[in-house]
Amino acid sequence: GPLIDGSLRVYKGKEPGFPELSIGVDEDTDSEAMVNALIDRGASFLKTYEMLSAKTFLGLLSIAKEKNLRVTGHIPLSIDLIEAIDAGLGGMQHIRNLDLACANNAEEILKQRQALLKNADSLPGSALRTKIHQLQRFVAIGNLDEERCIKVIRHLAANNVFQTPTLTINTLDSKRFYADQEWRDTYQFLPKTLQKNWYIGSIDMAKEEVSENDKIFEDWSM
């Protein structure tokens, strides 16, 4: 870290579950100075996040290229994946938002996202991101275009865009790893207050039914 996110950053330490992990940047930010400061602190790559504007993200890719830094992270919701690849994207995490790029109406839902990102309802960044995912993720998966997706994946491979799949995240709600006592035993390595919260939370969540969307997202991810 830190994550480099947009002005409506997700991890800003204000909402529960979203600690202070990010830097918020926009078109008015001196992005090169920010990148130089990260390099001075030992950064060897940049991790970008979903609420960056397309213009700011493309600017960061350009700066990173000049400084021989790879850029990885979540694909910003504001940009088409192919455009990001062509501009120098170096990696992706959790295959996040690949589903949006593989939909047969990818261009249409990109325009919808760009409109939503104007945030007419003044939502926090974390809530706005969740809203967009809820509106588009399963619509995109339902509109999967296999031929389009193969082209996108081949373009990722041809440009050496590495994947950090971390499929545990994508299947957490369907596979319910935390329902296993052996899994919960690993919480002993957490700070005491977190141990209790995680343990109670795991027990409670394990009682909930696996939703149809949980299974759909697992199948898509795997």
Regions found by a protein language model. Name each.
Residues 1, 15-20, 29, 82-88, ...:
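Metal-associated gating/positioning segment near the N- to mid-region
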Residues 1-10, 57-74:
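Alpha-helix-loop-beta-strand connector modules within alpha/beta enzyme cores
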Residues 4-8, 46-48, 71-73, 91-94, ...:
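Hydrophobic faces of well-ordered beta-strands that scaffold small-molecule active sites
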Residues 12-13, 48-58, 76-82, 98-101, ...:
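Active-site environment of divalent metal-dependent phosphoester hydrolases
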Residues 15-30, 142, 214-215:
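Active-site mouth loops of central-metabolism enzymes
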Residues 20-37, 75-82:
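Short, acidic/polar
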Residues 34-45, 52, 98-222:
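Active-site neighborhoods of metal-dependent hydrolases
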Residues 42, 63-69, 86-92, 160:
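Glycine-enriched alpha-helix->loop->beta-strand junction motifs that scaffold or abut catalytic
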